[in-house]
Amino acid sequence: MQLLKDKFGRVHDYIRISVTDRCNLRCVYCMPEEGLTFLPHEKVLSKDEIVSFMELMVKFGIKKVRITGGEPLLRTDIVEIVRGLGAIPEIEDISITTNAMYLAKKAEALKEAGLTRVNISLDSLHADRFQAITRGGRLQKVLDGIQKAEEVGLFPIKLNVVLIKGQNDDEITDFLQFTKDKDINIRFIEYMPIGHAGTSWKEKYLPLDTIFKACDDASFEYEPVDSIRGNGPSENFRIKGAKGTFGVIHPVSAHFCDSCNRLRLTADGYIKACLYWDEEMNIRPFIHEPVKLMQLVQKAIDNKPENHEMALKLQDEVQSNKPTWRRMSQIGG
């Protein structure tokens, strides 16, 4: 099997597929509140195009898929997309990232279709604050979604918490306490300068050393834990006696580019080898031309930089490439 390897020796076996750029929320770090233009439906990859693409990609070593958006559960055919991917025997793991507003309704059908596990965005445990950060989200719907995911067996359940200075950094201890009572993995993620968030991100950025300080201040004893299924770049820990775990993902303060194994496919059919850089290849016209398609995929991988240089932006230093101005919802979070 010919593997998808870049010039730094990194083998790519994981892809994140965005199935929509639309979302029912407007999280402050992801999308502006208004003035948005979304892709016309005919510009979005169809279920058949996604499945055909993956039937080819598995022949080159891709074996893990994460479905993203926008909010993927807005797709009326999301269960059929999962079912189509689940029918490809080489795919070992199918996961989804969701805001969970519709998860309680769809978790059982998604599990039956072949979904393996779920990541849920949850940036506050206080209903009013959660509504403010998401510009309209209802915390109880997320909690109901978590419960339903537990009931149907979508394990491990991971909660993604973007740490935002002055907005939710006073809840770190509450999130850590949450892991004591539930068998879930809470992942604290540094605020990143992507798209819309890139203009004001320094005001909201906190390094993830803040998490460990909060543990120490609360007298929580913690220790590293072995790899959690699908843990990716997360460094994981367990508070003594806790049922669950917590992790830290620090793309800015300590990048993990040397072990990056992922590609991204946008909802409109562009391959991106690096989340941060602007370069992307339009593969949609060649979905049914495997030779040309794989040439473009390999070209994207060949052009992948050694690292994303987000830390240089933190220091106002010059970067070697042009950062993306796509929103996270347009790339696929």
From Swiss-Prot:
Example of a GO biological process term: Mo-molybdopterin cofactor biosynthetic process
User: What family does this belong to?
Assistant: Belongs to the radical SAM superfamily. MoaA family.
Q: Which residues are involved in binding S-adenosyl-L-methionine?
A: Y29, G70, S121, M192
- Domain called Radical SAM core: residue spans: 7-221
Name its co-factor(s).
Answer: [4Fe-4S] cluster
Q: Which gene encodes it?
A: moaA
Q: Name the CDD domains on file.
A: Radical_SAM, Twitch_MoaA
Question: Record-annotated residues binding GTP?
Answer: R16, R66, T97, K158, R262, L263, R264
Superkingdom in the source lineage: Bacteria
Record-listed [4Fe-4S] cluster 2 binding positions: C257, C260, C274
Q: Which HAMAP family match?
A: MoaA_B
Recorded protein name is GTP 3',8-cyclase
Listed under subunit, the entry gives: Monomer and homodimer.
* EC number annotated for this UniProt entry: 4.1.99.22
> Catalyses which reaction?
GTP + AH2 + S-adenosyl-L-methionine = (8S)-3',8-cyclo-7,8-dihydroguanosine 5'-triphosphate + 5'-deoxyadenosine + L-methionine + A + H(+)
Species of the source: Listeria innocua serovar 6a (strain ATCC BAA-680 / CLIP 11262)
Q: What does this protein do?
A: Catalyzes the cyclization of GTP to (8S)-3',8-cyclo-7,8-dihydroguanosine 5'-triphosphate.
